[in-house]
């Protein structure tokens, strides 16, 4: 029996005395494991610290100048004067990031030291007649902690002197690369983590001495700190390596962001990031006790695996829901409306045990509920309104008289518009079915997102799942826990972003999808490309199908327009030709996703003039691609052709005069071919053609090749459509002319229908005859394409969106003014260009002869 004190608790044995007499130094660390600093917070917001937890922002400890093992000064001590060069700014930011790394590493090492401190005394007692723990229990609890401590101690000791003598020639990439290569030790720790917690808990229940030790571990702080060591539990410290490794990529992203691409560190940091990301993807399923809700029927912790906002079709209307995927069930909830100041709560709409959840096959699935589709023009009009509000907010911020109340009012309105867009833009169906007979329908914005949810659910279903039924109380507890457990806190809309967050890229992304490897069997393979815009993803391009191969080589180039985009997604499909696998919603054959991946569009990388090569790894498959970005100001430049014998880049009047035609031959032939075999092609004019095919057609038209008709008959129809778009884009001036640009902008803005009709018809009459004849010829063609909208999915508004900004653009003189304004104002102009073309597309047939005979009610000079 253990000796008991007068208070009824066991007296301290020699192990307690040894433990309590240890010299810890000083620190500030609260019981929740959050480091707090009493020193000034000046400059902390400018420093990209790598936090230990969401609520902490560790600063460097103050060191004496003669301290050998000191770290770099705080940000306020190293800020450069206001006139520093770009290289100086980059150097400063790198040093600040690395200083943050050192501060974070010092805290982490101190935590590991505190965790390891009782291990040696415990081992010493293990061989005595009264052991506190057995050697096996000690090894189970402290498994791999020593190895993790040593690798971080070595990293810290080598990084510290480098940061103290930091300049633009300093290299640290090798240290991060080595640290990343040692992450395997974390895998062993993670695999043992749950067992270590269980062992520690059992030992605490059986042994009062160990209970006292595990509840009162002392964590010292940075050297020279005057604060006392803080008490932390063993359970909290055992979680630190889990928390640390899941954040291992953050600092690498920060360093890469502020490291020039030609710096020796850049490839090493990229390699370290790749290793870290691959490692994290292999352990992301492991248990996180902070995301544990309640226990499953088998007594295991129920963990949140995935959550996000989806649009559900319920009672023939769209509802925004928050979907929570736990290890054994799927729960659909809605956020309750609460008054200001009250705690927000979720209301459970339904749940399905994963054991009862099935995905109906295309032939088995019932048709999607009848729902009024939102017209495309309403979606585009809402985007235009959002762009206008964004520009107004920016104007208010720049104005000296801009009031916060006005900005908040504008942001509130923008939130309403974006919420509407998020609710009514998704169109891709996602069905889940309960074995008991109930079906649920969601609408998603991209196939990538649908695949993520399906794969996450199917992965969990491979485990030994048991049927379950939650009692009302259990359901209430689980639903109440969702608010704290959720990982997605806000709907993905712009108004939720901080003011200093990247607005994304505006312009054109050129992507070459080269090849893919890693397929286990020969298949018919193709890829699609998605980019984000206004908070959701849209499919932008599709490669051709490479048949019967394990190593497809597409080598296809696409030009993708970006509207505030920050991410590129690539999906790889196996083409299915089995007509029994039809999607009942649109009679399209459902192809199988073989892999998917995404990459952040880092402006520093993609905005370089050179092509950037990259690889996306997905389910063992590697897709190689290159990309290059061109900004909107570059896309506005129209370079006249040096060879006046061709057609591309040559004035339309010169071409028609040479050909003795009213409409250029290239326009007539491309339109004829599209109407012959492409008018029912899904996404005609919207889906990008292969760049190499388009360039081949361009060269043939420029050379007036005799084989052009043969080429057109053999060429992919999207390449022909792309050639027509390229011709209009490369005209020395847009088809509707530079001179009339502002007049078209003013005309479409008129409110009175009669005045608008007068103005818009007069503007057409003001065009040169070749331009007018070509425009009317194209107009009738686009109307015929739109007549097939039920098949080709191309409405008048879709076609106006594709051709409007090409046929009507500001001159280079006017565009220079646009480049000095916010990208949202430019975007607003694009919407107006779309509206101009849409006006003529929706207008009754316009005859050239009648138009020329007509006169205005009022004579005006444009």
Swiss-Prot record:
<dbReference type="GO" id="GO:0005096">
    <property type="term" value="F:GTPase activator activity"/>
</dbReference>
<feature type="site" description="Arginine finger; crucial for GTP hydrolysis by stabilizing the transition state">
    <location>
        <position position="686"/>
    </location>
</feature>
<dbReference type="InterPro" id="IPR035892">
    <property type="entry name" value="C2_domain_sf"/>
</dbReference>
<dbReference type="GO" id="GO:0035556">
    <property type="term" value="P:intracellular signal transduction"/>
</dbReference>
<dbReference type="GO" id="GO:0005085">
    <property type="term" value="F:guanyl-nucleotide exchange factor activity"/>
</dbReference>
<dbReference type="GO" id="GO:0030424">
    <property type="term" value="C:axon"/>
</dbReference>
<feature type="region of interest" description="Disordered">
    <location>
        <begin position="30"/>
        <end position="84"/>
    </location>
</feature>
<dbReference type="InterPro" id="IPR000219">
    <property type="entry name" value="DH_dom"/>
</dbReference>
<dbReference type="Pfam" id="PF00168">
    <property type="entry name" value="C2"/>
</dbReference>
<feature type="domain" description="Rho-GAP">
    <location>
        <begin position="650"/>
        <end position="848"/>
    </location>
</feature>
<dbReference type="InterPro" id="IPR037769">
    <property type="entry name" value="Abr/Bcr"/>
</dbReference>
<comment type="function">
    <text>Protein with a unique structure having two opposing regulatory activities toward small GTP-binding proteins. The C-terminus is a GTPase-activating protein domain which stimulates GTP hydrolysis by RAC1, RAC2 and CDC42. Accelerates the intrinsic rate of GTP hydrolysis of RAC1 or CDC42, leading to down-regulation of the active GTP-bound form. The central Dbl homology (DH) domain functions as guanine nucleotide exchange factor (GEF) that modulates the GTPases CDC42, RHOA and RAC1. Promotes the conversion of CDC42, RHOA and RAC1 from the GDP-bound to the GTP-bound form.</text>
</comment>
<dbReference type="InterPro" id="IPR037865">
    <property type="entry name" value="ABR_PH"/>
</dbReference>
<dbReference type="InterPro" id="IPR000008">
    <property type="entry name" value="C2_dom"/>
</dbReference>
<keyword id="KW-0966">Cell projection</keyword>
<dbReference type="InterPro" id="IPR000198">
    <property type="entry name" value="RhoGAP_dom"/>
</dbReference>
<feature type="domain" description="PH">
    <location>
        <begin position="303"/>
        <end position="462"/>
    </location>
</feature>
<dbReference type="InterPro" id="IPR011993">
    <property type="entry name" value="PH-like_dom_sf"/>
</dbReference>
<feature type="compositionally biased region" description="Basic and acidic residues">
    <location>
        <begin position="34"/>
        <end position="44"/>
    </location>
</feature>
<dbReference type="InterPro" id="IPR035899">
    <property type="entry name" value="DBL_dom_sf"/>
</dbReference>
<keyword id="KW-0770">Synapse</keyword>
<keyword id="KW-0343">GTPase activation</keyword>
<feature type="domain" description="DH">
    <location>
        <begin position="93"/>
        <end position="286"/>
    </location>
</feature>
<dbReference type="InterPro" id="IPR008936">
    <property type="entry name" value="Rho_GTPase_activation_prot"/>
</dbReference>
<feature type="compositionally biased region" description="Polar residues">
    <location>
        <begin position="54"/>
        <end position="67"/>
    </location>
</feature>
<dbReference type="InterPro" id="IPR001331">
    <property type="entry name" value="GDS_CDC24_CS"/>
</dbReference>
<protein>
    <recommendedName>
        <fullName>Active breakpoint cluster region-related protein</fullName>
    </recommendedName>
</protein>
<dbReference type="InterPro" id="IPR001849">
    <property type="entry name" value="PH_domain"/>
</dbReference>
<dbReference type="Pfam" id="PF00620">
    <property type="entry name" value="RhoGAP"/>
</dbReference>
<dbReference type="Pfam" id="PF19057">
    <property type="entry name" value="PH_19"/>
</dbReference>
<keyword id="KW-0344">Guanine-nucleotide releasing factor</keyword>
<dbReference type="GO" id="GO:0043197">
    <property type="term" value="C:dendritic spine"/>
</dbReference>
<dbReference type="Pfam" id="PF00621">
    <property type="entry name" value="RhoGEF"/>
</dbReference>
<feature type="domain" description="C2">
    <location>
        <begin position="488"/>
        <end position="616"/>
    </location>
</feature>
């Amino acid at each position: 029996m253990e000796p008991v004190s007068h208070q009824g608790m066991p007296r301290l044995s020699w192990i307690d005395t040894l433990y309590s007499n240890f010299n810890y130094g000083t620190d500030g660390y609260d019981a929740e494991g959050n480091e707090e600093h009493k020193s000034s917070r000046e400059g902390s917001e400018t420093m990209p610290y790598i936090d230990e937890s969401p609520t902490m922002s560790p600063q460097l400890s103050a060191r004496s100048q003669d301290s050998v093992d000191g770290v770099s000064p705080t940000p306020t001590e190293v800020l450069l004067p206001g006139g520093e060069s770009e290289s100086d700014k980059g150097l400063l930011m790198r040093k600040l990031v690395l200083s943050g790394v050192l501060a974070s590493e010092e805290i982490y090492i101190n935590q590991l030291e505190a965790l390891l401190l009782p291990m040696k005394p415990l081992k010493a007692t293990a061989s005595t007649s009264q052991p506190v723990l057995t050697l096996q229990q000690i090894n189970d609890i402290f498994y791999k902690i020593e190895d993790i401590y040593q690798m971080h101690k070595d990293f810290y000791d080598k990084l510290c002197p480098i940061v103290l003598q930091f300049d633009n020639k300093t290299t640290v990439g090798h240290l991060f690369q080595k640290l990343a290569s040692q992450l395997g030790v974390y895998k062993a720790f993670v695999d043992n983590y749950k067992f270590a917690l269980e062992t520690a808990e059992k030992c605490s229940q059986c042994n009062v001495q160990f209970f006292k030790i595990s509840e009162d571990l002392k964590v010292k702080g940075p050297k020279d700190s005057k604060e006392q060591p803080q008490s932390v539990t063993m359970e909290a410290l055992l979680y630190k390596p889990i928390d640390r490794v899941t954040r291992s990529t953050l600092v690498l992203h920060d360093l890469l962001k502020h490291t020039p691409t030609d710096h020796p560190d850049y490839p090493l940091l990229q390699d370290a990031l790749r290793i870290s990301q691959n490692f994290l993807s292999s352990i992301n399923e492991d248990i996180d006790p902070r995301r544990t809700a309640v226990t499953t029927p088998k007594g295991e912790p129920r963990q949140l695996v995935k959550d996000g906002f989806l649009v559900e079709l319920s009672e023939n209307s769209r509802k925004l829901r928050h979907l929570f995927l736990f290890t054994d069930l799927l729960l659909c909830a809605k956020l309750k409306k609460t008054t200001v100041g009250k705690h927000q709560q979720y209301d459970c709409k339904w749940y399905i045990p994963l054991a009862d959840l099935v995905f109906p096959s295309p032939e088995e699935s019932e048709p999607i509920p009848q729902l009024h589709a939102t017209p495309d023009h309403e979606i585009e009009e809402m985007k235009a309104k959002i762009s206008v509000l964004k520009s107004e907010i920016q104007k208010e911020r720049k104005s000296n008289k801009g009031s916060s109340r006005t900005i908040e009012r504008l942001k509130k309105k923008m939130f309403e518009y974006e919420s509407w867009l998020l609710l009514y833009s998704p169109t891709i169906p996602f069905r889940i079915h309960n074995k008991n007979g109930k079906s649920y329908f969601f609408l998603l914005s991209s196939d990538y997102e649908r695949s993520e949810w399906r794969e996450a659910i199917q992965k969990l279903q491979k485990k030994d799942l048991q049927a379950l039924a939650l009692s009302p109380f259990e359901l209430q507890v689980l639903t109440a826990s969702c608010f704290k457990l959720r990982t997605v806190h806000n709907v993905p809309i712009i108004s939720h972003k901080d003011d200093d967050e990247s607005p994304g890229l505006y312009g054109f992304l050129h992507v070459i999808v080269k090849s893919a490897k890693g397929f286990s069997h020969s298949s018919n393979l193709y890829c699609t490309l998605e980019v984000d815009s206004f908070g959701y993803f849209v499919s932008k391009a599709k490669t051709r199908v490479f048949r019967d191969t394990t190593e497809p080589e597409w080598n296809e180039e696409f030009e993708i327009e970006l509207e505030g985009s920050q991410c590129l997604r690539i999906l790889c499909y196996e083409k299915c030709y089995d007509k029994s696998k039809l999607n009942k919603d649109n009679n399209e054959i459902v192809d199988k996703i073989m892999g998917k991946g995404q990459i952040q569009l880092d402006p520093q990388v993609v905005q370089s003039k050179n092509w950037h090569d990259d690889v996306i790894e997905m389910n063992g498959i590697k897709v190689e691609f290159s990309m290059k970005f061109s900004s909107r100001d570059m896309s506005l430049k129209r370079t006249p052709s040096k060879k006046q014998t061709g057609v591309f880049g040559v004035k339309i009047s010169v071409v028609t005069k040479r050909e003795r035609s009213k409409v250029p031959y290239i326009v007539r032939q491309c339109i004829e071919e599209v109407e012959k075999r492409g008018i029912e092609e899904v996404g005609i004019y919207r889906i990008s053609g292969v760049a190499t095919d388009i360039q081949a057609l361009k060269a043939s038209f420029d050379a007036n090749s005799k084989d052009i008709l043969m080429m057109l008959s053999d060429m992919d129809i999207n390449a022909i459509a792309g050639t027509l778009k390229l011709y209009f884009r490369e005209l020395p001036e847009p088809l509707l002319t530079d001179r009339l640009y502002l007049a078209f902008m003013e005309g479409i803005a008129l409110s009175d229908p009669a005045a608008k009709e007068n103005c818009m018809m007069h503007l057409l009459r003001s065009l040169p005859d070749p331009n007018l004849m070509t425009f009317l010829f194209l107009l009738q063609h686009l109307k015929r394409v739109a007549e097939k909208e039920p098949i080709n999915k191309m409405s008048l508004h879709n076609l106006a969106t594709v051709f409007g900004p090409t046929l009507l653009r500001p001159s280079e003189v006017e565009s220079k003014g646009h480049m000095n304004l916010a990208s949202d104002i430019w975007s607003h102009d694009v919407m107006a260009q779309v509206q101009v073309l849409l006006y003529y597309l929706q207008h009754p047939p316009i005859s050239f002869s009648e138009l020329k005979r007509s006169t205005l009610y009022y004579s005006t000079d444009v």
